[in-house]
Amino acid sequence: MSGTDYEFDWDDNKAAVNLSKHGVDFKDAMTVMLDPLAMTIFDVEHSQDEDRWISVGRSSGGMLLLVTHTFVTTGPSSALVRIISARGATRHERQQYEQGTSQ
């Protein structure tokens, strides 16, 4: 997702609940989009009303996070990302990320 200018949005109430539940601030979660090694997949299971994506990558603070978000292209090199949730990556997700970055 590099080479793209991102604008970020989220629901402040959802961000507060996420911080309390998972200990991850959406301001940290948005930096995952800047990780050139981040992996992003389409979230088929949760995309009934809107297209949702799941990204696993390192935040600017070094945390490996899983971020659920929407992604809407707004121009040739710009996008709006709405963060839905964020949490620390599980052991399995960490292994997938590390395998993907070592290839």
Regions found by a protein language model. Give the residues of each.
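Ribonuclease/tRNase effector modules and their secretory precursors
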Residues: 1-103
